[in-house]
């Protein structure tokens, strides 16, 4: 089950609340053979160092992360989680590396492509090297959030890019 760690934007409130909530949820899910996965998805959860600290404190095998290549905005103009302009972004490569030890899945986010089929915001060879160097062998989901291609075309372009990078 994928969850978000929303709530307070204040680390001293967010961290203990996140640990407590995840421990309770993961404990309930454990006997049911269910993994709880947290996506970096705005606010403090997009600060990979903080999210990794939460994962360390939870310390349960069935609780992990879903690193999303495109969700490292930690502060937005309007103070919201998703909609307004990003003012502060955590380094996506550093963040992915910090979240990979806990990864139960990976989200390959894409927005736009150049003429050669490369994603214009994310260096896919670099970020996939981080994923592979972590020893990850699980699923890589595709998430297209661009507007230049249809949803299907964007997903297929991302899949093609991943296949090329992983050759």
Task: Please provide the spans of the model-predicted regions.
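A short helix->loop->beta-strand "cap" motif at the edges of active sites that frequently abuts
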Residues: 34, 133-138
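Acidic/histidine-rich catalytic cores of soluble enzymes
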Residues: 17-129
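Active-site groove signature of glycoside hydrolases
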Residues: 1-13, 32-45, 141
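A generic structural signal for well-ordered alpha-helical segments enriched in polar/charged residues
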Residues: 24-27, 133, 160, 164
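Active-site clefts of carbohydrate-active enzymes
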Residues: 103-116, 137-151
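Metal-dependent catalytic neighborhoods of phosphoester/phosphodiester hydrolases
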Residues: 11-15, 150-154
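A short, flexible beta-alpha/helix-coil linker loop
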Residues: 6-10, 72, 111-114, 147
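C-terminal helical cap(s) of enzyme catalytic domains, especially alpha/beta-barrels
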Residues: 151-167
């Amino acid at each position: 089950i994928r969850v978000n760690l929303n709530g307070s934007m204040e680390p001293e409130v967010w961290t203990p609340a996140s640990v407590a909530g995840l421990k309770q949820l993961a404990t309930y899910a454990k006997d049911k053979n269910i993994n709880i996965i947290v996506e970096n998805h705005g606010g403090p959860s997009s600060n990979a160092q903080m999210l990794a600290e939460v994962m360390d404190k939870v310390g349960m095998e069935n609780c992990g992360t879903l690193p999303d290549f495109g969700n490292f905005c930690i502060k937005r103009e309007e103070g919201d989680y998703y909609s307004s302009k990003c003012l502060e972004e955590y380094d996506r490569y550093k963040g992915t590396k910090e979240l990979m030890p806990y990864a139960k899945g990976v989200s390959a986010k894409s927005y736009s492509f150049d003429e050669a089929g490369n994603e214009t915001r994310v260096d896919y060879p670099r970020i996939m090297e981080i994923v592979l160097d972590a020893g990850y062998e699980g699923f890589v989901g595709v998430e297209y959030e661009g507007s230049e291609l249809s949803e299907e075309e964007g997903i297929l372009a991302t899949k093609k890019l991943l296949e090329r990078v992983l050759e």
